[in-house]
Amino acid sequence: MTNLMDHTQQIVPFIRSLLMPTTGPASIPDDTLEKHTLRSETSTYNLTVGDTGSGLIVFFPGFPGSVVGAHYTLQSSGSYQFDQMLLTAQNLPVSYNYCRLVSRSLTVRSSTLPGGVYALNGTINAVTFQGSLSELTDYSYNGLMSATANINDKIGNVLVGEGVTVLSLPTSYDLSYVRLGDPIPAAGLDPKLMATCDSSDRPRVYTVTAADEYQFSSQLIPSGVKTTLFTANIDALTSLSVGGELIFSQVTIHSIEVDVTIYFIGFDGTEVTVKAVATDFGLTTGTNNLVPFNLGGPTSEITQPITSMKLEVVTYKRGGTAGDPISWTVSGTLAVTVHGGNYPGALRPVTLVAYERVAAGSVVTVAGVSNFELIPNPELAKNLVTEYGRFDPGAMNYTKLILSERDRLGIKTVWPTREYTDFREYFMEVADLNSPLKIAGAFGFKDIIRAIRKIAVPVVSTLFPPAAPLAHANREGVDYLLGDEAQAASGTARGASGKARAASGRIRQLTLAADKGYEVVANMFQVPQNPIVDGILASPGILRGAHNLDCVSKEGATLFPVVITTLEDELTPKALNSKMFAVIEGAREDLQPPSQRGSFIRTLSGHRVYGYAPDGVLPLETGRDYTVVPIDDVWDDSIMLSQDPIPPIVGNSGNLAIAYMDVFRPKVPIHVAMTGALNASEIESVSFRSTKLATAHRLGMKLAGPGDYDINTGPNWATFIKRFPHNPRGWDRLPYLNLPYLPPTAGRQFHLALAASEFKETPELEDAVRAMDAAANADPLFRSALQVFMWLEENGIVTDMANFALSDPNAHRMKNFLANAPQAGSKSQRAKYGTAGYGVEARGPTPEEAQRAKDARISKKMETMGIYFATPEWVALNGHRGPSPGQLKYWQNTREIPEPNEDYPDYVHAEKSRLASEEQILRAATSIYGAPGQAEPPQAFIDEVARVYETNHGRVPNQEQMKDLLLTAMEMKHRNPRRAPPKPKPKPNAPSQRPPGRLGRWIRTVSDEDLE
């Protein structure tokens, strides 16, 4: 198929930027003419998950400024605590004065884990609420999911690792530029003072009033006690002002003073900013005391989203003491003006992304891009080139019509990130006015987008003088579609104003209007030469870069695929592919490629069908001549003809399309390809349906034929579906499957063992088929070979197997593959096919069945560990999870079945307590007090050792405790009278006794007694 996509795209940049903000900014094609610059600003934040593992991210997808959203963490008390604001990378008010938001997308996901955590847990729930933040009252999971009934504005239970994407879609058009609250020159002021210019466009005003004759009466209020007079929910992100008056009357005590304060409160209940209305204001008895006020709050003071306000008063007696009784009555009004707060998208809608059950300390990443139209300040304008936006009402109308049907077109505000990535190709088709809408056709959106294109493009032709001839030629269609809304009294199309009324029109009746075939290409209108020939529209220039290609209207044409083969011999196909053909009424050889011209076949009624091989007579009776032409592509209402050197076709695949064309003569575009053989007025199936179905899907069409047909998806289908994400089972039934009023000779049936209806039937081929049938009946091996061939053909892998055979002439690779192929009933095959059997895909379990199986697996595992209370029913009540550590500790200590979803933190973090035995304590005391053989330790020392064991919950003493015990033992030994006596110490200076001398063996030693 000829690929002209690079030369034929007509992109609408605005809608492309809306649906895919990462492609960059684009000027809004309305009639707001201000010189501006386009800029993309990124936002990247790594948010730390709190202790509870839950939090809330509030996005303002349409806010025209640096504010993107805010992050709140859920506290254990159940309330939210403000963490930080989410802004663009650059602070826009520093360099720019005005801005308009073009598009914005943000992604929330987590891919990091804190220390000690080895699994990425947690889910994300997201909802776009068509209201303000203060109007939400329930922030739980059920509360968020019930905030809207639109299925395209909420998603739930998305894994935190996959993430969600928030897409900003406009809620209004024709919006003016918004002042950013930028600093302005302040001549003559102190340099420390800061003057800013905030937006005053489209203010949101909150007025707090009481019913008639209502007065707030304070009877004997103690002095110094705060009294709340007014409370109200408000929403503010930008500068605000508050004004009003209070009237104090019936003051019965002299020297009364009052303090009046206004508090602006954030989403988490904390005070964002406080304004003092009056301080030490004296009240006079016997009169009405008026307290007027008018205060302002700049954007810089609003550090988090404001959702409510309250007014409080404190009265006290001058010179008195706290607690003195005071009596007064007050009435009044209050008005809060949020500047720019009523700008569409500034405060509503809001998108809330809640994450839960994420590991504490994990990081949730928020990343995205915001595209703006910006008007720089005078300093930056000196070095920055600005340009006017391109006024394109056709693109604006197309964008409005697409987004007005976004629910039917599957365009959401919140997406699972993976799904949003898959839809990018579909968004590119929506943004390209010349795309054939193949992916949209697979999703079922093609008819809606085609109708929108028809109504959006003709409006443009009424805007420019060069389009006058086409406007007159197309007047019937425009008047039918738009009626009185096509032109205003001035003669200018209402679409030029860009107002919402340009998006009106009878879209659902659009398909009934006659398409004149004129196309608009880059605001250049081309009238084809001799566009109407024999009732067939032939336009030589529908697309840029395709002016030399012939195009015809699908109105009055039927389509059918033909399998084309190249043969080494008459029975062995070498290559197999398919080509789409169209049947056109009349003799139109000028539209055929040169290889087909001059070739025709006659029908039973004598008419000609050009493009067929002249082989006998076509078994049909027709009332006129027809031409069969090959085609390369199919667009909304036109088909592009092919000039490839394709030979004349043979076979009976086109007979059904010719008969359908001759009998019914359709006058509406046919958006389906036909295939089937005629046999005695009955339509029968033909072969190679897998190949033909793939050809139809490549052109974004369905294939219709006799009966339902189920496709065996093989490797070819896996590759094809990866490139073209369509449903491979798109086999439709024709509205008329039986043509009873065709003559009995209108068709014939081919009985070919090869099931190749496109092979030319010759006597030699018929003899070969008969011989093959006889051989199959006589030889079971040959019959098996025919069955293998039919299996290859039915699954569309004949060409793949032929190419594989060329690369494996000795079949070594095939033998190894078959030897190592999985066997039926093996573990891998049971895991893949279940109990359905080898080669039969088992039905996957439903979510409920999968959950029950998971509960049973967890329960069985717990039973093997001796945890018998974790039955499948208990696991289901516990959130389909096994027992937590707290539940296990509770069961081990109490032997009672823990409550599901109860964590029992006291049992998880409690200190382990075990008592040491008396023998263990005595042995330790003896070892510490002295060596074996010494005196037993006293009872006081044994008690000291026991106290150490008790302090350590049964554990042995640590080093410090051991030192203390040794010192205690030494002290006790010195003062203990029952201690063992010390060993005598030798005298260091005493002389040793002289040993007797040796006198001989026979001489006795003379003693002192002998001397006496």
Swiss-Prot record:
Catalytic residue list: S653, K692
Domain of life: Viruses
Domain Peptidase S50 residue range list: 514-755
Annotated site location: Cleavage: A442, F443, A488, A489, G495, A496, A502, A503, A513, A514, A755, A756
A GO molecular function held by the record: metal ion binding
EC number(s) per entry: 3.4.21.-
Cited Pfam families: Birna_VP2, Birna_VP3, Birna_VP4
GO biological process, one term: proteolysis
Effect of S497K: Partial loss of pVP2-VP4 cleavage and complete loss of VP3-VP4 cleavage
Reported impact of D515S: Partial loss of polyprotein processing
Residue segments, region Interaction with VP1 protein: 1003-1012
Binding site for a divalent metal cation: D30
Biased composition (Basic residues): 975-986
Biological role stated in the UniProt entry: Capsid protein VP2 self assembles to form an icosahedral capsid with a T=13 symmetry, about 70 nm in diameter, and consisting of 260 VP2 trimers. The capsid encapsulates the genomic dsRNA. VP2 is also involved in attachment and entry into the host cell by interacting with host ITGA4/ITGB1. The precursor of VP2 plays an important role in capsid assembly. First, pre-VP2 and VP2 oligomers assemble to form a procapsid. Then, the pre-VP2 intermediates may be processed into VP2 proteins by proteolytic cleavage mediated by VP4 to obtain the mature virion. The final capsid is composed of pentamers and hexamers but VP2 has a natural tendency to assemble into all-pentameric structures. Therefore pre-VP2 may be required to allow formation of the hexameric structures.
Name listed for the protein in its UniProt record: Structural polyprotein
Organism in which the protein naturally occurs: Avian infectious bursal disease virus (strain OH)
